[in-house]
Amino acid sequence: MSDRFEATYLIETPHDVASVAQELAGEQSTATSSRMPGETDALIRDFGARVEHIEALPPAEAPSLPVAHTLGQRVHRARLTLSWPLHNIGDSLPMLLTTLLGNQTGMRRLSGIRLERVAMPQSFIAAQPRPAFGIAGTRRLTGVQGRPLIGSIVKPNIGLAPEQTAAMARQLAEGGVDFIKDDELLANPPYSPVARRAALVLRALDEAAQRTGRRTMYAVNITDGLDEMRRHHDAVVQAGGTCIMVNLNSVGLSALLALRRHSQLPIHGHRAGWAMMTRCPALGMEFQPYQMLHRLAGVDHLHVSGLGGKFWEHADSVLQAAHECLTPLDTQAGAADDRALPVFSGGSTIFDVAPTYQGIGTADLIFASGGGIFGHPDGLAAGCASLRQAWEAAIAGQELRAYAQSRPELAAALARGKPVRKA
């Protein structure tokens, strides 16, 4: 596959699958609704998409989406693999995305199309910027080795003045948190501009570091227009920051690529809006292509949701997403480590630690918790300590309650019990 790239789709149609597959391949390469004079056999051979494989699946009971359909007609499902010559897109990530999920998603004869996996030639992968810091760089900047980074977020997530955000960040840092991030809804509002918030928070973290001996990493949300993001980034650097954050789906691949070229700091990628792209099983994409696109563009940390949290995604899907982040893209000998640090968040507590570790088998992650820290009966420091202790137990293979017998912070968190999830 050195000169071609492949994509695998789940498709659904009331029409002949083989015919629809050929139409889909044509739509995303050389074909129009009818063959044009310039569409020669040679052009199709050199630039056309190919149907590589069709796997028939059990039929659907009814079309998942509106489609030209005769009542009672069988609705076919299939797994379809297409390939394209790499010279169709060159080294362009935006054009890769256009090819993978373009006009074919609106084809009238499809009642469902979902991108499942993408395989790219190593030459394409090597041409992309990919993470500048990744796992090793983040650990170096935080000084955390051998365990996950314990993270949190300042609450309330919006509405605080920079001085209030800084005061809360200082409490978290003095309590032992390794990583603090802005909420995805807080970027550069008039009541808390990036430059002032970053300056005050980072000064507070420096003061906390004088007491703790460790400087907490703060991911400053700089989501904005590209020119503004560059200016925000520079303000964070000037203030002594060690991380920036962007809402990936809001800024797009091109802005992320440009920011990666400009940035001197790790890029923390928030996937706000991801559910819109994946929650419908007949549309959108799986996480494998999503994380590949953003890691190729240079993101260092990537959210994957959490186990037992407040969001819809089930545990197996969350763990698979983390595995994808931790799977190298460039597998050539001597290639730089392009893995991204998966970020578990969204209601994570001590009760999610052991299944998280058992599910991914590594401590290379950020484990972000709000209620698990703020809600501890003995305060922030005890909440942070209880999470570290839960991870110590998981890594050592010890049962949580047994490990808590000599650790009052963990014991108190256990006594509080699991949070009650709303139905």
Curated annotation (Swiss-Prot):
Cofactor binding note of this UniProt entry: Binds 1 Mg(2+) ion per subunit.
Q: Cite the CDD domains for this sequence.
A: RLP_NonPhot (cd08207)
* Residues at which Mg(2+) binds: K181, D183, E184
Q: Which UniProt keywords apply?
A: Magnesium, Metal-binding
Tell me the domain of life: Bacteria
What are the BP-aspect GO terms? carbon fixation
Please provide, alphabetically and separated by semicolons, the GO molecular function terms listed in this UniProt record.
Answer: magnesium ion binding; ribulose-bisphosphate carboxylase activity
Q: What is this protein called?
A: Uncharacterized ribulose bisphosphate carboxylase-like protein
Give the organism the record lists. Answer: Bordetella bronchiseptica (strain ATCC BAA-588 / NCTC 13252 / RB50)
